[in-house]
């Protein structure tokens, strides 16, 4: 038998009180704002003056204004969704990705062409085969995926669609008390 406790946060002590033999934890993850992703295994150098957002911020209603660069190094659907939404909200959007296609993975689901088309029709500037190497006070430095040639794209804010960080504190707390299972 399986019992689900959806939307109820339990701490380690409460979970252990149940006396379960097996525990499955699904605590989710949050989008990283530091640029760690496929291109970067360490945070991107960033000037603190540049406002940085994640998909979590956008979905919570915290929206940038003005010229926005979306750095999509996730390659699934989220970068395209963020770009379209912000363009609809009146932002001047540039989507930068080191991939050769917008939302590259969606080529596997035959959606990539439609996503690219929608973004172009929404007025989004699409910059392919370029990564982001630094967040400056007034723009982002990008590099060519093939030559590493660099240039600066001026912007007022950046949305990073990169890696996610697991919410795994509960897991580690449980593992530290494994003898009590």
Protein language model regions, located:
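Glycine-rich loop(s) and the adjacent beta-strand/alpha-helix scaffold that form part
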Residues: 52, 179-181
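Short boundary/hinge segments that flank catalytic cores
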Residues: 41-43
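Rossmann-like NAD(P)H-binding beta-loop-alpha module
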Residues: 65-93
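A Rossmann-like FAD-binding core segment of flavoenzymes
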Residues: 1-33, 46-49, 57, 63-64, ...
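Iron-sulfur cluster-binding electron-transfer modules in prokaryotic oxidoreductases
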Residues: 57-59, 77-78
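Glycine-rich phosphate/pyrophosphate-binding loop
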Residues: 36-37
């Amino acid at each position: 038998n399986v019992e689900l406790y959806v939307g109820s946060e339990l701490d380690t002590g409460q979970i252990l009180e149940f006396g379960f033999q097996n525990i499955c934890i699904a605590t989710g993850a949050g989008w990283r704002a530091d640029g760690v992703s496929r291109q970067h295994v360490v945070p991107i150098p960033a000037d603190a003056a540049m406002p940085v957002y994640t998909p979590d911020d956008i979905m919570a209603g915290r929206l940038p204004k003005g010229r926005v660069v979306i750095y999509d190094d996730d390659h699934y659907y989220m970068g395209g969704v963020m770009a379209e939404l912000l363009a609809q909200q009146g932002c001047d959007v540039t989507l930068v990705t080191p991939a050769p296609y917008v939302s590259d993975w969606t080529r596997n689901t035959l959606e990539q062409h439609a996503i690219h088309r929608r973004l172009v029709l929404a007025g989004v500037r699409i910059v392919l085969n370029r990564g982001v190497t630094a967040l400056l006070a007034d723009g982002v430095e990008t590099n060519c995926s093939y030559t590493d040639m660099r240039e600066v794209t001026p912007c007022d804010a950046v949305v990073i669609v990169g890696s996610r960080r697991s919410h795994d504190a509960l897991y580690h707390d449980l593992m530290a008390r494994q003898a009590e299972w």
